[in-house]
Curated annotation (Swiss-Prot):
A single BP term in Gene Ontology: gluconeogenesis
Catalytic activities: alpha-D-glucose 6-phosphate = beta-D-fructose 6-phosphate
The name this protein goes by in its record: Glucose-6-phosphate isomerase
Pathways per UniProt: Carbohydrate biosynthesis; gluconeogenesis; Carbohydrate degradation; glycolysis; D-glyceraldehyde 3-phosphate and glycerone phosphate from D-glucose: step 2/4
E.C. number(s) listed in UniProt: 5.3.1.9
Species classification: Bacteria, Bacillati, Cyanobacteriota, Cyanophyceae, Acaryochloridales
Native source organism of the sequence: Thermosynechococcus vestitus (strain NIES-2133 / IAM M-273 / BP-1)
Length: 529
């Protein structure tokens, strides 16, 4: 296609939202009217299924749940007065609590104001708040945010070292539907221990974000925590950023949550249009489906050309991969669906893996995220008539063209600037695109059985560890792996037993390892008395 034909093709496929000043360009994805025509029946079904989902249908059949994250930014859509009231009350509670913290009405018992947030959560309870904080938090926020989003002792040490004496002015958010998620529970227990060591009452600093009546809610209530905010069982973790999970930390940092919600609401309205060419989320789902032949054959590379959007690819990794990565479809057929997502930021990536994107395996499509406004301050000229922002834009356009010349597909999402409204719109755009794609390929995009399988396997390993330690505690002599395996009736688990013992020995957990580490089968282990 020559340059003039490509220009016309760009105009033919361009989507623009006037109120959000939001563009979606899929002209470099190889789409044709024939592709649209072929998938129109599937999209008609997907639009109808999405309409039913928003009306309160059981859209997550495996867990028997409604899927209601769209109601969070437009409570009038919720299917019952009770739900509408719960959503509005939760938002009002977030605003009131944040205002009281900012004013000092809610303050540390030692005096002064809260200055730090320690957010404890994992998965959607961390990735969304981290993305929004990186994108939108002011340079000098009313409270600085820190995250415990793993069960890594070295990570705990680093965060608590950063807090230092400011632990006494730290507000702790514990975010978990039940409170039983091991990583979140461990982070909470580590935090409690740090507060106790510092002579501080944890309850005077603690807030729970959880399901009403959950184990965590009961702990918070019985111990007199500062507040309890509701989560809803009809909102999944990866779509929870615009619930209390994300709104509370955002509001505490001084981010305008009304604009976040408004941006999402406006995008939701745009993505309800039952016409592929006039619906930006449908255009994304169409492009993904065409690129990967409906089987996820191409990876999704996310390249935001703005430092503040660095974490968008990590956020989308969970949203896309946890939603679409499924073994079976809704009819029980083995399909192994999914789209792999990775990315960093432009132009860093042009000095990293874009070399492979242009000249290596053509197993991907690129999504450029373009931000029109360079910054808030006037830019100097780094060359006559050229600013640093001109270079950023030029490198985006140059990479897009270089990929096109090698028949590497790409699409571009353009926003005017990074604001709460545009970030809310981005979140809503991809939530809807993922939902539509899930309907196109007939999978449940709202459960995560693979994650649950991993949790069960981890629990089994910890149970095995307890058995191993008990055997060694009771033995007067060193034991080899075979003897340990026989004693716990697990003769086929030599590798797991070895790996568990190696970890315990490395951490001075009472296990002594004897022998040559290069010969694991010859090692012996004993309990250090």
């Amino acid at each position: 296609m020559d340059a003039l034909a490509l220009w016309q093709h760009y105009q033919d496929w361009l989507y623009y939202h006037p109120e959000l000043e939001f563009y979606v360009d899929v002209s470099r994805m190889g789409l044709t009217p024939e592709v649209v025509h072929r998938l129109e029946p599937a999209f008609e079904r997907a639009f109808e299924q999405m309409k039913e989902l928003e009306a309160g249908a059981i859209a997550n059949p495996d867990e028997g749940r409604m899927v209601g994250h769209y109601w969070l930014r437009d409570p009038d859509l919720a299917p019952s007065p009770e739900l509408r009231s719960q959503i509005r009350d939760a938002i009002a509670q977030v605003k009131q609590f944040s205002q009281q913290v900012h004013s000092g009405a809610i303050a540390p018992p030692q005096g002064g104001h809260f200055t730090e947030i320690l957010s404890i959560g994992i998965g959607g309870s961390a990735l969304g708040p981290q993305f929004v904080a990186a994108a939108l938090a002011p340079v000098h926020p009313p409270l600085n945010i820190h995250f415990l989003d793993n069960t890594d002792p070295a990570g705990f040490e680093r965060v608590f070292a950063e807090l230092g004496d400011r632990l006494r002015t730290t507000l702790v958010l514990v975010i978990s539907k039940s409170g039983g998620t091991p990583e979140t529970r461990n982070g909470m227990l580590e935090a409690q221990a740090r507060f106790q060591r510092a002579g501080l009452a944890f309850a005077d600093h603690a807030v729970a974000v959880t399901l009403p009546g959950s184990g965590l809610a009961q702990v918070a209530e019985s111990n007199g925590w500062l507040a309890i905010f509701p989560m809803f069982d009809w909102v999944g973790g990866r779509t929870s950023e615009l619930s209390t999970v994300g709104l509370l930390p955002a509001a505490l940092q001084g981010i305008d949550i009304d604009d976040l919600l408004m941006g999402a609401k406006l995008m939701d309205q745009a993505t309800r249009v039952p016409n592929i060419r006039q619906n930006p989320a449908a255009l994304l789902a169409l492009a993904w489906h065409h690129a990967g032949k409906g089987r996820g054959e191409k990876d999704m590379v996310i390249l935001p050309y703005k430092d503040s959007l660095l974490l968008f690819s990590r956020y989308l990794q969970q949203l896309v991969m946890e939603s679409l990565g499924k073994e079976t479809d809704l009819n029980g057929n083995i399909v192994h669906q999914g789209i792999a997502v990775y990315g960093n930021k432009g132009t860093t990536d042009q000095h990293a893996y874009v070399q492979q994107l242009r000249d290596g395996l053509p197993n991907f499509f690129v999504t450029f995220i373009e931000v029109l406004r360079d910054g808030q301050e006037p830019s100097i000229e780094v060359e006559p008539g050229i600013t640093a922002g001109d270079y950023l834009s030029g490198l985006l356009l140059g990479t897009r063209q270089a990929l096109y010349e090698k028949n590497r597909p790409s699409l571009t999402v353009t926003i005017p600037e990074v604001t709460p409204k545009t970030v809310g719109a981005l979140i809503a755009l991809y939530e809807r695109a993922v939902g539509l794609y899930g309907f196109l390929v007939n999978i449940n995009a709202y459960h995560q059985p693979g994650v649950e399988a991993g949790k069960k396997a981890a629990a089994a390993n910890l149970a095995l560890q307890r058995q191993i330690v008990k055997v060694l505690e009771q033995s007067d002599e060193p034991l080899d792996l075979g003897a340990i395996a026989g004693a716990i009736n697990a003769p086929d688990q030599l590798e797991r037993i070895y790996l568990i013992l190696r970890h315990l020995a490395a951490n001075d957990r009472g296990i002594e390892q004897l022998g040559d580490p290069a010969q694991p089968s010859q090692l012996q282990f004993r309990w250090q008395r």
